[in-house]
Regions:
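Short coil/turn segments that connect the beta-strands within blades of beta-propeller domains
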Residues: 46, 91-93, 136-138
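Structural motif
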Residues: 57-61, 103-108, 148-155
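Short loop/turn segments that connect beta-strands within beta-propeller blades
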Residues: 64-68, 111-115, 157-158
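Surface loop/turn motifs at the tips and blade-to-blade linkers of beta-strand repeat domains
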Residues: 29-35, 74-79, 121-125
C-alpha cells in the first residue's frame, strides 16, 4: 500500500511540474554577434524588433526569425535621431518608435512598404517614453509624461496608416 501511495504521489508531482523555458542558443548567438548590445525587444509573430548598438550608435533593428536575418529599414535610422523604444506589428510591416530628435522626443510610425516614417502627435501634448503596438498594427499604447506625471495613452491609428 505504501508503494502504491508513493508511486501515486510521484505521478502527481511529475504531472504538475511546469515545462521549463527553452532558450534558443542558435538565435541568441546570432543576436549577440550582430551588434555590440541590444535592448528593448519587441516580438511580433516571426519578427523581432530591438534597439541595437553598433559603433557607439543605437539604431532600430528588425530580425526575421524564420530566415534568421536582419531586414533593411530604409528611411528609419536617421543620423539625427536617437531611438528610445520600439514595437513591431505581427506582420512586421509597421514599427512604432519613440525617438529623440532635435531636442524633442517624438512618436513615429514606420511603414516598411513605403520606407517612411510619419510623426504621430499626442493629444494632449506630452513627452512619449515607451510604446507598444498591438499585433494588428492598428492600436498603440504609449507611456507619456505630462506635467510631471506618467500617463498611458491608447491611440487608434487612422486607416490611411494601417492599409498597406
Amino acid at each position: 500500500m505504501i508503494r502504491v501511495a508513493l508511486l501515486f504521489s510521484l505521478v502527481l508531482v511529475s504531472g504538475c511540474s511546469s515545462p521549463r523555458p527553452t532558450p534558443r542558443p542558435d538565435l541568441n548567438g546570432l543576436l549577440r554577434q550582430s551588434v555590440n548590445s541590444r535592448r528593448d525587444p519587441s516580438l511580433g509573430g516571426r519578427w523581432l524588433a530591438s534597439l541595437g548598438q553598433r559603433n557607439g550608435r543605437e539604431r532600430v533593428e528588425l530580425i526575421d526569425l524564420r530566415s534568421r536575418s536582419p531586414v533593411p529599414l530604409p528611411g528609419l535610422n536617421r543620423a539625427d535621431a536617437q531611438p528610445i523604444s520600439v514595437s513591431v506589428s505581427a506582420d512586421g510591416q509597421r514599427l512604432a518608435v519613440v525617438q529623440q530628435r532635435e531636442d524633442r522626443t517624438e512618436l513615429v510610425l514606420y511603414r516598411r512598404n513605403v520606407g517612411a516614417t510619419q510623426r504621430l502627435p499626442l493629444d494632449p501634448p506630452g513627452v512619449p517614453r515607451r510604446v507598444s503596438l498591438d499585433g494588428s498594427g492598428r492600436r498603440l499604447a504609449v507611456q507619456v509624461s505630462r506635467n510631471g506625471r506618467w500617463d498611458v495613452d491608447l491611440i487608434r491609428l487612422p486607416l490611411s496608416l494601417i492599409h498597406i
